[in-house]
Amino acid sequence: LQAMQDETCLNKVRDKHVTILAKNMAGLKELFELITLSHTKYLSYNSKSTTNVVAEPRIIRSEIEKRRMNGNLLIGSSCVNGEVFDIAQTRSEKELEEVMRFYDYIELQPLGNYQFLIDRNSISDENRLKEILTGIIEKAVALHKPIVASSDAHYVHPNQKLIRDIYINSQAI
């Protein structure tokens, strides 16, 4: 299967969010390298026509792995759109453990950040959500992974929400 991969394979898979933090100046350089690659070599276009082209920066795991070997980057599991939450929701504990080994720390957000999943019926109710989050916590503790409470913030001031909403919704135009 790997031999069948080509430059367009990124367009065919669902992307997952990840958080990458630089520990020092060398890590900052490595982070900038990843950002550059995501906006050039791995830029994903989700339109076949040349009008109204929408592009999304992406980076493949092997590029992250290559740069993290130097010890200058920390890799976090990110938000509800990350791999850990997805696997915890849909797969086995063994698969969750396997996936979590990749991350340096595990991120969790307040329950309210996941409410849209209940509203969309992706998760049946708050009890199921708590089961998923508890499973993530228990597995992180077992693997000695630090658990970080984050807010998945995309803006600082409430009036900036409108700007973000316009940006997010304009990607579909």
Provide a role label for each language-model segment.
Residues 1-173:
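Phosphodiester-processing cores and adjacent nucleic acid-binding clamps
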